[in-house]
C-alpha cells in the first residue's frame, strides 16, 4: 500500500521537524522554526506538557489512515536518533477493541501495516502484547538490541493501579535478565520493582505512539506517559486537545479528493421505528444492486452492511437485540445475514466481513462499535431510538465513513453513507450527526438532511 499524497505530506512535515530538531537540539525551537518556514508563525508555540520530551501530533480525520501514517513515522524518528539507540516502540490505544485490531494487523506479515514496518527495518520486527511482555516471550535483552520491538498496550493497563495495572509494577522473574543488563534505572518509577515490566520499558526509553490521543490528557495519563520515559511522543487524533503540538494538519477535503471517505452523509427521517426498519432493508438491498453492477463493471467487490443502533432498556439487555433479530427475520432476512455486537455478545469475532464468502449484511449494536471497529462495507446507520429520545449517533457515525477500496466508484450511491432515524426532533438529530462529523474531523457541509419521505438513492455525486 502506497501513501496517499496528503499522507506523504504528513511524513514530510515530520521529517522536516526532525531535521530542525537535530540542527537546534531544542524541540521547542525546532517547532517554532518549522511553522516559520510554513509562513504560519502563530502555530509555532510549543506546549511543553512532557518536559524534556518532543511531543508532536498528527491531526487526521477519521478514515484518513492514522495507523498507516504511524507505521511510516517510526523509521524517520529512529533515523533522527543516535544509531546506538534501542529501537523500542510503545503503541498506546484507548480500548480493548482497538487493541485487538492493532495487534492483529501489526502481527500479520501479510498486512500492509506490518509489511511497511518490515521493509523499513529489514523484517527484524517483533510485536508484543502486554501478556507476552509479562511472560518474557521472545522479549529479552538480546532481542531488543537486535530488532524493532513494538509493544501494543492499552491506556488502562498502565494508567491505574487496579488488578491489571499492578502487574506492570510487580517483581517479575521473567524479566530479571533486563535488570542485570540495564543496571540501575536513571528514572525509577515510584513503587515499581526493578524487574517490573513498567520499569524495564522505562529503561528502554521508547518512542511512544498515542492512538486517539485526545483520550490521554488526564493527570493519570500524563503520569503514565512520563513513567514510560519516552524519547519521543507522537499523538494521533482527529480532534486534538488545545495543548497538542500539531505538526501536520490533514483537511477533510484532502480525504475526499483521495477517495478515502463516504461523504456526504445522507440523513432520512421517518415517522415510526417500523418505517426505519423496513426502509433500511430496502435501502441496503438497493445499494447491493448498485454494488453488483459495480462489480460487473470494475471487479471490485462490495457487500453493503447496515448497522442497527438499538435502544436497550437500561443496560444492553439481550431481549432488545433478539427482538430486533426476530423482526428482521420476519421481514424475510435470513438468520445468517444478521449479527449482534454488544458489550456482552460478539458474533463478529473471527468474522472477515470483507470476504465474499461472508453472509453478514445487518449488524445490531448500541455503542459497542464506537471505537476500534472498521469495515468499509458499513454504509447505513439506522437508529431505533424512541421518537422522544435523543438520537445518540455521534459516537458511532465514524464507523460508516470509510470508503471501500479507497477509490471513486462508478455508482454514485456507493460513494456516500446513510443515516435513518425516527426522531421527533429531526433538527436535533441532524445537529448530533454534525457533532459526530466534527468529532471525526469533518464539518456540517458533509451532512445532507433529506426532507422528502420517498426513499431514493443519489444518481450523481452532487447531492
Tell me the role of every PLM-derived stretch.
Residues 52-56, 87, 360:
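Pre-Walker A (Motif I) flank of P-loop NTPase domains
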Residues 87-109:
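Conserved Walker A/P-loop ATP-binding site and its immediately adjacent core
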Residues 373-386:
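A short beta-strand element within the Helicase C-terminal
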Amino acid at each position: 500500500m502506497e501513501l496517499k499524497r496528503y499522507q506523504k505530506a504528513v511524513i514530510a512535515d515530520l521529517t522536516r521537524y526532525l531535521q530542525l530538531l537535530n540542527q537546534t537540539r531544542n524541540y521547542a525551537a525546532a517547532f517554532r522554526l518549522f511553522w516559520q518556514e510554513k509562513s504560519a508563525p502563530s502555530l509555532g508555540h510549543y506546549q511543553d506538557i512532557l518536559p524534556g520530551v518532543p511531543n508532536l501530533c498528527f491531526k487526521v480525520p477519521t478514515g484518513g489512515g492514522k495507523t498507516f501514517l504511524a507505521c511510516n513515522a517510526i523509521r524517520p524518528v529512529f533515523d533522527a536518533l543516535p544509531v546506538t539507540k534501542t529501537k523500542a516502540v510503545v503503541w498506546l490505544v484507548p480500548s480493548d477493541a482497538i487493541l485487538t485490531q492493532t495487534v492483529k494487523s501489526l502481527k500479520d506479515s501479510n498486512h500492509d501495516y506490518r509489511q511497511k514496518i518490515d521493509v523499513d527495518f529489514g523484517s527484524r520486527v517483533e510485536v508484543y502484547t502486554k501478556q507476552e511482555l509479562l511472560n518474557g516471550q521472545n522479549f529479552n535483552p538480546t532481542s531488543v538490541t537486535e530488532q524493532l520491538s513494538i509493544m501494543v498496550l492499552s491506556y488502562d493497563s498502565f494508567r491505574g493501579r487496579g488488578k491489571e495495572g499492578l502487574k506492570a509494577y510487580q517483581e517479575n522473574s521473567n524479566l530479571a535478565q533486563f535488570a542485570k543488563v540495564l543496571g540501575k534505572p536513571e528514572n525509577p518509577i515510584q513503587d515499581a520493582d526493578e524487574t517490573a515490566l513498567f520499569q524495564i520499558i522505562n529503561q528502554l526509553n521508547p518512542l511512544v505512539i498515542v492512538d486517539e490521543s485526545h483520550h490521554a490528557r488526564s493527570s493519570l495519563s500524563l503520569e503514565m506517559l512520563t513513567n514510560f520515559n519516552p524519547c519521543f511522543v507522537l499523538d494521533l487524533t482527529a480532534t486534538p486537545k488545545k495543548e497538542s503540538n500539531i505538526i501536520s494538519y490533514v483537511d477533510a477535503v484532502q480525504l475526499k479528493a483521495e477517495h478515502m471517505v463516504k461523504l456526504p452523509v445522507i440523513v432520512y427521517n421517518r415517522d415510526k421505528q417500523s418505517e426505519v426498519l423496513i426502509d433500511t432493508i430496502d435501502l441496503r438491498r438497493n445499494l447491493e444492486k448498485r454494488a453488483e453492477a459495480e462489480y460487473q463493471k470494475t471487479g471490485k467487490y462490495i457487500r453493503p452492511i447496515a448497522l442497527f443502533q438499538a435502544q436497550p432498556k437500561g443496560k444492553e439487555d439481550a431481549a432488545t437485540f433478539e427482538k430486533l433479530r426476530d423482526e428482521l427475520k420476519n421481514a424475510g432476512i435470513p438468520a445468517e445475514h444478521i449479527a449482534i455486537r454488544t458489550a456482552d455478545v460478539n458474533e463478529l469475532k473471527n468474522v472477515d466481513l470483507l470476504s465474499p464468502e461472508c453472509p453478514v449484511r445487518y449488524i445490531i449494536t448500541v455503542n459497542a462499535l464506537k471505537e476500534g471497529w472498521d469495515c468499509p462495507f458499513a454504509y447505513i446507520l439506522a437508529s431505533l431510538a424512541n421518537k422522544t429520545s435523543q438520537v445518540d449517533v455521534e459516537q458511532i457515525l465514524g464507523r460508516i465513513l470509510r470508503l471501500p477500496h479507497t477509490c471513486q466508484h462508478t455508482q454514485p450511491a456507493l460513494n456516500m453513507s446513510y443515516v435513518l432515524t425516527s426522531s421527533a426532533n429531526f433538527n436535533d438529530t441532524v445537529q448530533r450527526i454534525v457533532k459526530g462529523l466534527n468529532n471525526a474531523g469533518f464539518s456540517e457541509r458533509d451532512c445532507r438532511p433529506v426532507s422528502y419521505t420517498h426513499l431514493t438513492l443519489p444518481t450523481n455525486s452532487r447531492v
